[in-house]
Amino acid sequence: GTLYTFRLLSKICDANGNVIEELTPEGEQIEGISQSTYDVMREGMYRVVHAAGTAAGAFTGLQIDIAGKSGSVQENLSRANHATFISYGPYNDPKISVTVAIPHGYMAYNAAVVCRYIYQYYFGYIDMEDILDKSYNTLGESATYSD
């Protein structure tokens, strides 16, 4: 496959919308991994969202069986960590991959909760009104929200 450098931009424009620079994807060809390595990675990602995994609390009772990996990125000591969560599901027949990155989101759990909403929305368990309703909580716990 191809391993691409992570980028959020495809081009840079001036204030009038004129393209200053096109940013072409940069990638390198990589060799595949062994089946045993793949199996270990897959099992590890499954454990992250189940039982005592680091993101299990965000996915308890989720209607779709998924696998994922949590992560926090430290930029510097004066700002909150970036929160990240990568995932795919359903676990045994993947249809979708979801990645959530929240700049200065404090901890990966916060990204995992957003990820849960995406899965529930994509597979039709909730709709946009549920997501926008601040009293709605997909975690099944009493929730308090403040603006």
Question: What is the predicted role of each segment?
Answer:
Residues G1-E28, R42-E129:
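Active-site beta-strand/loop architecture of penicillin-binding DD-peptidases
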Residues D130-D147:
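Short, highly charged C-terminal tails/helix-capping segments
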